[in-house]
Amino acid sequence: MAEVQAVVAEIEILQRMYAAFNRRDIETVLASMHANVDWPNGMEGGRVLGKSAVRDYWKRQFEVLDPNVEPKKSTREADGRIAIDVHQVVHDKSGKLLVDQMIQHVYEFRDGLIQSMEIRDVAQA
């Protein structure tokens, strides 16, 4: 029962995080992350480590892109991570559509906070 409650709590954290991200409320998103979070840099490649690096990455991203991510479905993986199927739409600052696709975000939690995230093609899921 406690495990089910933990999963429900983690999914609620992720739902709030997606809503905050789409509002560009970076500080609210960062509050759901572990201090040394490991995050993918989907724009430039590689990964960023720690909240301040994630903050800097998103500031750079929001200067040139207008991403929107809408969670559609969540599942618990065998290793305990949570996979979220996400509809991702990205425009450039002039409004030109760059990306409209389904992807999957896979989260690992530690101490009730997001420890890491990876991005997968839905076909890999």
Show which residues each predicted segment covers.
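A beta-strand edge to alpha-helix "cap/lid" segment located at domain peripheries
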Residues: 1-9, 55-125
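A short gly/proline-enriched turn/hairpin at secondary-structure junctions
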Residues: 38-48, 60-64, 120
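Short, charged low-complexity linear motifs
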Residues: 24-27, 40-45, 91-94
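Short, low-complexity N-terminal intrinsically disordered segments enriched in polar/charged residues
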Residues: 1-32, 36, 113, 125
